[in-house]
A protein has these predicted regions:
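Membrane-interface helix-loop junctions and terminal tails of multi-pass membrane proteins
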Residues: 1-258
C-alpha cells in the first residue's frame, strides 16, 4: 500500500516532490517500528517489557528493512540525513535534491514518533521513570562525555555509510538480486550489536532530532525534559561520520573494484 502511494506521488507531483513524499513514508515507518520496539521493551505493562537489547537491535534492523523496501524504488530510501549527505558527497544525488531528502526525513521522523505516542498511549502514565519515556523517542549516552559520545556516533555512522556505498557499488552482484536492502538492514543490526552500547547508536540525525522534538511538544504524562543539552551529539556526529565515509570510500575504493 505504501509503495503504491509513493508511486502515485512520483507520477502526480513529479520526481522531486516524489522524493519528499517517499522519504516521509519510509522514515515514518522506520521510526514507528524502531522507536516502537524501544517503547515495547521499556514501557510499563508492555507485553515485551524488559525483553532486552537484542530485541531492540533486531527491531531496528527490521524497521530499516521495512522502510527501505517500501520506498526504495522511488527515492532510494535514504531515511537518514547522514546517508543523504554521504551520497551527495559521493555524487549520487545533486545538492538541489539533497534538501528534499532532508525535509522528507525530518517530517517522516516526527510523524513516526507521533504514531508511537498514540500506539503506547495507555502506557506512558504507568511508566514512572521520565528517562525511559525519553528513550522511547531519542538516544542518550550510557556515560555522558560529549567528546567521546560524538566520536562514537562518528564511528557508527562511518560504518553505516561506508557499508551502504560498498553494498550498493555497481560491481556488487547483490544489486541485481534485490538483496541490497536486506544487507543494509543486517548492517544496521550489526552496528547496533557492536557499537550501540555507548550512545544507543542514533547514526541518523532525523531519527533522534525529529522524535526529540515530538517528545518536547506531546502531552506525555510525567515526561520530564527532552535533554536538549545532548541533542547536538546525535546530529553532528552522524553528519561528520557520513561525510568522512563518503570521502574515504571515494579516495580508497572509488568507482571500480580493487
Amino acid at each position: 500500500m505504501f509503495a503504491h502511494l509513493a508511486a502515485v506521488l512520483v507520477v502526480v507531483h513529479k520526481p522531486h516532490l516524489g522524493i519528499v513524499g517517499s522519504e516521509i513514508i519510509g522514515t515514518g515507518l522506520l521510526i514507528l517500528l524502531g522507536d516502537g520496539v524501544v517503547a515495547a521493551v521499556l514501557l510499563a505493562k508492555s507485553k515485551a517489557e524488559n525483553s532486552g537489547w537484542i530485541v531492540i537491535t533486531l527491531g531496528w534492523g527490521m524497521a530499516v528493512m521495512v522502510g527501505a523496501y517500501s520506498v526504495g524504488p522511488f527515492s532510494g530510501a535514504h531515511l537518514n540525513p547522514a546517508v543523504t549527505l554521504g551520497l551527495w558527497i559521493h555524487g549520487s544525488i545533486t545538492g538541489s535534491m539533497a534538501w528534499k531528502y532532508f525535509l522528507g526525513e525530518m517530517i517522516g521522523a516526527m510523524i513516526g514518533a507521533f504514531l508511537v505516542f498514540l500506539t503506547y498511549y495507555l502506557h506512558w502514565r504507568d511508566t514512572e521513570d521520565p528517562g525511559l519515556k525519553l528513550a522511547c523517542f531519542s538516544t542518550g549516552p550510557a556515560i555522558r562525555n560529549y567528546g567521546w559520545n560524538v566520536l562514537t556516533e562518528i564511528v557508527g555512522t562511518f560504518v553505516l555509510v561506508f557499508g551502504i556505498l560498498a553494498i550498493g557499488a555497481p560491481w556488487q552482484a547483490n544489486n541485481a538480486s534485490g538483496l541490497t536492502t536486506l544487507l543494509v538492514a543486517l548492517l544496521v543490526l550489526g552496528i547496533g550489536l557492536s557499537l550501540g552500547g555507548p550512545t544507543g547508536y542514533a547514526i541518523n540525525p532525523a531519527r533522534d532530532l525529529g522524535p526529540r522534538i515530538m517528545h518536547a511538544i506531546l502531552p506525555i504524562p510525567g515526561k520530564g525534559g527532552s535533554d536538549w543539552s545532548y541533542s547536538w551529539v546525535p546530529v553532528l556526529g552522524p553528519l561528520i561520520g557520513g561525510a568522512l565515509a563518503a570521502i574515504f570510500f571515494d579516495a580508497v575504493i572509488g568507482s571500480a573494484p580493487l
